[in-house]
Amino acid sequence: MKYAEISSLAIEELKEKIKIEQENLRKLKFAHTISPIENPTKIKNTRRLIARLETALNVKGS
C-alpha cells in the first residue's frame, strides 16, 4: 500500500489493518522458521507496512 492510500483510511480501519498485518507477519515468521519461504523479503515488506500504518495512525491520532 502506498502512503496516500494509507492516509485516506479512517482510524478504525487503520487499527484493523494493523491487526491483520501483524497476524500475517507472525505467520510468515513462523513459516520461515520451519522451512525457508520462497520470498523472504515479504517479511521485511510486511514489517515496513505495519510501520507505515502505525505512523499514519499516530498522525491522525494527534
UniProtKB/Swiss-Prot annotation:
Looking at the keywords, is Zinc-finger present?
A: no
Q: Which GO molecular function annotations are given, in alphabetical order?
A: structural constituent of ribosome
InterPro entries this protein is in? Ribosomal_uL29, Ribosomal_uL29_CS, Ribosomal_uL29_sf
Biological process (GO), any one: translation
Q: Name one GO cellular component term.
A: ribonucleoprotein complex
Instruction: Recite the UniProt keywords alphabetically.
Output: Ribonucleoprotein, Ribosomal protein
Name the Pfam families for this protein. Answer: Ribosomal_L29
PROSITE patterns with a match to the protein in the record: RIBOSOMAL_L29
Q: Which NCBIfam families match?
A: L29 (TIGR00012)
HAMAP family the UniProt entry points to: Ribosomal_uL29
Q: Give the family per the record.
A: Belongs to the universal ribosomal protein uL29 family.
Please give the name of this protein: Large ribosomal subunit protein uL29
State the organism of origin: Amoebophilus asiaticus (strain 5a2)
